[in-house]
Amino acid sequence: MGKYFGTDGVRGVANSELTPEFAFKLGRIGGYVLTKDATDRPKVLIGRDTRISGEMLEGALVAGLLSIGVEVMRLGIISTPGVAYLTRIMSADAGVMISASHNPVADNGIKFFGPDGFKLTDAQEEEIEVLLDAQEDTLPRPIGADLGSVSDYFEGGQKYIQYLKQTVDEEFDGIHVALDCAHGATSSLATHLFADLEADISTMGSSPNGLNINDGVGSTHPEGLAKFVLEKDADVGLAFDGDGDRLIAVDENGKIVDGDQIMFIIGKYLNAVGRLKKQTIVSTVMSNMGFYKAVEDNGMQSIQTAVGDRYVVEEMRANDYNLGGEQSGHIVFLDFNTTGDGLLTGIQLVNIMKATGKKLSELAAEMKIYPQRLVNVRVTDKHAVTENTKVAAVIAEVEAAMAGNGRVLVRPSGTEPLVRVMVEAATETACERFVERIADVVRAEMGLTD
């Protein structure tokens, strides 16, 4: 991670940390770095989620891109994976998504995609950061006919949906799907997609007003969907986040099915039909111990990466794997798209239910989940935790007490000013005790409370 770029682009409080002035500068510099080698008039696609600040930042970003001579196509409200897909198949020089994903409405972010639909390399981000910190703007300033132009391509979302439908073998008639769109980017896309696939649909979290994105709904609040599934007597619930790049599911009994379980279910099915490359699933260090055991017990392997879907994708690309993801619900199918995709994951999951004739509860029951607790501690310097001797000492103390029957992971968040404390243990009681013991020391040492 650099000065401006985190694990998922540039983020901050909109109009305070992430200002329109900065967005203009980022558009200008990002546009230059990503299109300077273009032989024709460069083209960049821009999408956004439903946050009130999206239009403000989009306007500034577009102005910056136009000032460097880029042809801009605005996609309107669309999911992050939708932007990645369209960037690739429309032969654009770059794509940009304006979103802070699952973060609160006050936050926003800007993430770039290269012409191949993948997120930027570290080298590209570093080049942009160097120019952002330059004392003087020496980039080209085209005039007249060489200035950029802007157009709208709002039908891009429908093009993306048509593509997704081609990735499944079954129609979903007879399956009642409850959708929670987090009042975000999938609010329209999800309903159209599942209706086209003949599912019976009930929806919540699909009335965005600019302020309600992720507010008690979506993949970070699946308990609301769990109640909704029971109320509507649905067969499955699918909760997306604000920008639609992650999915958390709920079974017909209202029980939450997380990203680890979803990865296992899909991995097992793909392996059975001969479509799981190298019989391997790529996950992160945050995956539950039960995931690793279930993968191994079913004749598959797992590879661990650092937390962040970009690291999962890097490992998948480097070693030719086609399935990976995170417990948080970022699931990547490299056969179909270049980034985590909630809608794609959702239809693959329902497709497996239809193909096997099994309920989601039956599919999920094949993986035992070990008790796990995650506590987020808000701090000013999240990286200082890695060098704190008292934090290191309490981690060692807890690990010794668990005697190999559990694990501890303490790390700085890649996108927020948080230290994440995760503990897995043999029992819920031990898990709770150990995670609070470590979190208390982190709070005391960092000098802040949640």
From Swiss-Prot:
Co-factor remark: Binds 1 Mg(2+) ion per subunit.
Gene Ontology CC entries for this record = cytosol
- Catalytic machinery residues: 101 (phosphoserine intermediate)
Positions carrying Phosphoserine are 101
Q: Which residues bind Mg(2+)?
A: 101, 241, 243, 245
What this protein catalyses is: alpha-D-glucosamine 1-phosphate = D-glucosamine 6-phosphate
What EC identifiers does the entry list? 5.4.2.10
**Any idea which GO molecular function terms this record carries?**
magnesium ion binding; phosphoglucosamine mutase activity; phosphomannomutase activity
| GO biological process, any | UDP-N-acetylglucosamine biosynthetic process
Q: Which of UniProt's keywords are assigned here?
A: Isomerase, Magnesium, Metal-binding, Phosphoprotein
Q: How is it modified after translation?
A: Activated by phosphorylation.
InterPro entries (UniProt xref): A-D-PHexomutase_a/b/a-I (IPR005844), A-D-PHexomutase_a/b/a-I/II/III (IPR016055), A-D-PHexomutase_a/b/a-II (IPR005845), A-D-PHexomutase_a/b/a-III (IPR005846), A-D-PHexomutase_C (IPR005843), A-D-PHexomutase_C_sf (IPR036900), A-D-PHexomutase_CS (IPR016066), Alpha-D-phosphohexomutase_SF (IPR005841)
Supply the SUPFAM superfamilies for this chain.
Phosphoglucomutase, C-terminal domain (SSF55957), Phosphoglucomutase, first 3 domains (SSF53738)
Q: Which cofactors, by name?
A: Mg(2+)
**Which principal EC class is assigned to this enzyme?**
isomerase
- One Pfam family from the record: PGM_PMM_II
Family to which the UniProt record says this protein belongs:
Belongs to the phosphohexose mutase family.
HAMAP family, per the entry: GlmM_B
This chain's function reads:
Catalyzes the conversion of glucosamine-6-phosphate to glucosamine-1-phosphate.
- Name-wise, this protein is Phosphoglucosamine mutase
Q: Which organism is it from?
A: Lysinibacillus sphaericus (strain C3-41)
In the UniProt record, the gene name given for this protein reads: glmM
